[in-house]
Amino acid sequence: MTSRLPFLVNRPLLARLDREWQVLNHRPAVLRRARGWGLGVPFVSLDEVVAAAGYRSGTPAGSGTPAGPAGATEQPAAAANEVLRRLLLAARTDDVAGRVVLQRLLPGVIARARRWGVHRVGGSSDAFDELLSATWMVIREFPVERRSHCFAAALLR
């Protein structure tokens, strides 16, 4: 008889990421810094930047994915892609821009960790840790110049 591996992601790490996001989200110094990235969209919180980069709220309650920004409106795909492109350019040298991109990608990273985790000895917790680390490196080094569309999908490959 075979046992099914745990189907959970690293909850403590997700909780730390969530606490970090809550601290950064409305901090005036962080928002001033973000306005220097030339995103071309107005915002009063980093949640609004994530929404402008194409994040779509509406994930099922209790799914373990971050809640969508309150009151944020969905951007057309081309506009969202351009915001994400500019964030990726800023993320090469700015950790906060990289953190915004990571927040945009977290639901996809969590979903992939859950899928991969059932096949791993360490479960989805280990898969999430590894994917998060790899995602950060990809965000910081993504070759924006070689791609013109679908940045979020390319980042999650």
Predicted feature residues:
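Extreme N-terminal regulatory/targeting segments of RNA polymerase sigma factors
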Residues: 1-121
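Structural recognition of an alpha-helix C-terminal capping motif at a helix-to-coil junction
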Residues: 104, 126-134, 149-157
